[in-house]
Amino acid sequence: METVRISGKKRLSGEVRLQGAKNSALPLLAAAASVDGVSVIKNCPRLSDVDAAIKILRFIGCRVWREGGAVTVDATGICRCDVPRELMCEMRSSVIFLSPLLARLGMAEISAPGGCEIGLRPIDLHLSSLRLMGAEIGTEGGVLSCSCPDGLHGEKITLSFPSVGATEN
């Protein structure tokens, strides 16, 4: 790893407040669904993708509320394993709800993720990795039906190319 060293006559000190990042907040919100309890995500940004994730959490039975910059997710009431297309289409990374639903309920039904200005976001790495961990996955009419009758298990997975998104599931 490369290091940059800055030398000067005065020592730097102080604090810097960083804004919350969408790419961290979204996987944390989805992961909250895998816990039979309450999760608090602090410094959570106010963005449309975060709002879409909160809608999905509420739809599947979570209680979600904001206080200042924190989002609290009470996932004790999860009762649905399906996420309707209109909610999935609100954010491109909505596929990150697949693993928490599988782990928690043993099944999940989702449609392909939502749009992105960059272009199509394939989810084949997500699906092949989940299959290696014991998931059974079928598709019909654009809907992924997933189950893991024997539960998900750990597995050594080698991705065919580097992918941050595939590791979030």
Labelled PLM ranges:
Residues M1-N169:
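Structural preference for solvent-exposed beta-strand-turn elements
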